[in-house]
Amino acid sequence: MRHRLFTLLLGLAVLITAGCGFHLRGTTQVPAQLQTLVLDSSDPYGPLTRAVREQLRLSDVKIVDDATRQDIPSLRVLGSSETRDTVSIFQDGKTAEYQMVLTLQAQVLMPGEDIYPLSVTVFRTFFDNPLAALAKDAEQDIVRQEMREQAAQQLVRKLLTVNGSQEVKNRQQSTHSTAAATRS
């Protein structure tokens, strides 16, 4: 009896989530204009640039190595900053918990068009356990890597805003040109 009830409840859960259009977030569908681009960075083999490159590949973006090409869009990773602020302290005044902040600055250069700035900020908290000093360093490295991967995912998702702002700009230009043509 319990097995049938469990199967019924599981089936209802599947039907409800399928019926409402819920789906897990997969890879980002990058706009057609950005399916091929140049990835330009001051540290091309650094961990952040590698994370961005991996996210672009997961989104089926072809990365061109020739940074001098002017005919295809370019994603420039301008830089990143990591800060660490104290969130809480122990009774003896030592730091108990940090808030780590990673900010990534980038820009997209569209050939013959504008430069679109992108900024991504990722927050994480980190508990500083004074009894496990060696494990603390390893855990902090893992948290930093996860923050880089999350920032890279957000950066690739923000490429959609470049496409959206281009469409708005094109609509405004066509509206202005049709308004000027009707006045003439």
Curated annotation (Swiss-Prot):
It is found in: Cell outer membrane. Together with LptD, is involved in the assembly of lipopolysaccharide (LPS) at the surface of the outer membrane. Required for the proper assembly of LptD. Binds LPS and may serve as the LPS recognition site at the outer membrane. The lineage of its organism: Bacteria, Pseudomonadati, Pseudomonadota, Gammaproteobacteria, Enterobacterales. It comes from the Bacteria. A lipid is attached at residue 20 (S-diacylglycerol cysteine). One of its GO terms (molecular function) is lipopolysaccharide binding. This is LPS-assembly lipoprotein LptE. GO terms for biological process: Gram-negative-bacterium-type cell outer membrane assembly; lipopolysaccharide transport. Keywords: Cell outer membrane, Lipoprotein, Membrane, Palmitate, Signal. Its main location: membrane. Residues 1-19 form the signal peptide. GO terms for cellular component: cell outer membrane; transporter complex. PANTHER family: LPS-ASSEMBLY LIPOPROTEIN LPTE (PTHR38098:SF1).
